[in-house]
Amino acid sequence: MKRNQRLLSLLPASLLVIAAFAGCTDETIIYRDRPLYEEPLETALGFVGYTSTDSKLVVCGNCHVSAQAQWDSTAHAGAWNTLQASPGAQAFCEGCHTVSDLGNAVSEPAGHSATGEERYYDVQCESCHGAGLAHVEDPNKNTVPLAMMNVGDVLGDAGTGCAECHTGDHHPFAEEWAASGHGTVNAYPAGRDGCENCHTGEGALDMFGVQTNYTEKADLGEDGQHMAITCAVCHDPHGSDNGAQLRFPIDAPSEELNLCIQCHQKRGRPDPTTFR
């Protein structure tokens, strides 16, 4: 009986101690966004690469969600694994299967070529657009890294966009393009109203309804300058539902929906002396 009384007498004191400790454990939950990117090494020259290599979330994709989703379905998104699975893989191939100085305006080792880091695996946004760090730190229209549309002199120009990788004995697409009618601009039709849609790259993009910006755009039209029908005029670099990332299918029985026929359809009967 005395023991029970002693326990009861201690109960108020115990409750006071518990209340005091409860007051000391008051918590405020602070939510923090995850970091959008890891600060790149100085030698990477401003290339940021992946936020998460495992999930293949590019830093750019944190904001440009639809572009990330399109890119996910392209061969560029799996370029590193494609190389590793090839029995002919060589170290010198890595620059075209990663974010590096190839495919953009950078002229010295950058990204994977400079650091060897996994965050630069695959052909990501920056492979064509160039370093994105400045835009990530200060996202405004003046810091947007623009991709190149021109292919230029594929045999000698070091800054030739797509042609820096899609070239050579392995896949001579740039050489084939340069030898085709698409590789040159015929000044006469290019400068005529009604002809520019099929004789200039900028005109074709406008006809296709593509509203975009690129490095050369500001200079086009000045002093008769026009862009040829380059790779990205017919192929969507961000991806598409058509084969080879084409902007339109090539088997649609429609002048409005067939990529080639939108231009190559102006004669009543075939003429082997002209591309049209």
Predicted regions: what is each one?
Residues 2-11:
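Bacterial N-terminal signal peptides that target proteins for export
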Residues 24-276:
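Short sequence/structural segments immediately N-terminal
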Residues 12-13, 245:
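Enrichment for repetitive, rod-forming helical segments
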Residues 19-23:
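C-terminal motif of bacterial Sec signal peptides marking the signal peptidase cleavage site
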